[in-house]
Amino acid sequence: MTTAVPAITSVSAAPAPGARLKMHREGPVLVLTLSNPTARNAINPSVYRAAAKAMRATSGFRTVRAIVLCGEGEHFSGGGDLRRLARQRKLPASEQHGHIGALHEWIMAIQEAPQPVIAAVEGAAMGGGFSLSLACDLIVAAEDAKFAMSYVNVGLSPDGGGTDSLVRALPPQAALEMLLDGTACTAGRLYELGVVNKVVPHGEACATALAWAQQLARGPFEVQARIKQLVYSARGRSRREQLEAERESFLASLYGDESGERIKEFLSPRKKQETSEEGPAT
């Protein structure tokens, strides 16, 4: 069932001519759609700010249990608006500094959201569009989708966390190949590398991502948030520090309401019967 987004519809505005962020609810799932189809859903600072605001607002709604990010029409996002950047060169660097900061606030809002965030990629995910998809927790891509760190092709270094995301996911050599070469990479190749989670037929990325989000939305909200936090903070910790973080998270989960309800359900006679009928797990 499609419903309006409660209490946060004000951030779904038309930020600038040709570039919009659309939002709607599908039950417990919030769907954010990049809408600028005539320009392959190019994004700009107004979209960055609207999206970051939406993400931060959504973090406070436990009724929103998962988030899907997609593009309108045939593409996910071609990245930043090069015409705007060409004009920006005539203005002080301090102004562009603020614009990039807005993009990076959006990236951090995705990472810090308690809900799982799934990118649904059709067509092109280029430059900032690729960085944006990588910032999401999970990626569903159409089999003919193309991804490229195309910044280098126009004499730019990446933003939007692209370097960080690739180095977290890949060996340095593979990351540098994408960053220095700038050519398109297929969804299948990224799936083989472990960057893309699911590859689906053309036109089915959003529907598949939404179905996955609906499944995740049935999971334990607070535990999923803790898992995200553990994963994203692991690289900056020693093994001992991560083990301590896991212990604290486990204890918080064990004594929380979510585990109490789910453990009780799992140990119920009915659940035992279902498990017995399914056979041993090993």
Give the location of each predicted region.
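Hydrophobic/aromatic residues within transmembrane alpha-helices
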Residues: 32, 69, 81, 132-134, ...
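Charged catalytic carboxylate motif
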Residues: 46, 50, 102, 109, ...
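Glycine- (often His-adjacent) and acidic-residue-rich active-site loop
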Residues: 63, 71-109, 125, 153-155, ...
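C-terminal alpha-helix plus adjacent terminal tail
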Residues: 1-30, 182-188, 206-207, 211-282
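Crotonase-fold acyl-CoA enzyme core
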Residues: 108-222, 256
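Hydrophobic alpha-helical membrane-association signature
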Residues: 47-51, 99-102, 132, 246
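Conserved CoA-thioester-binding segment of acyl-CoA-metabolizing enzymes
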Residues: 1-72, 94, 108, 282
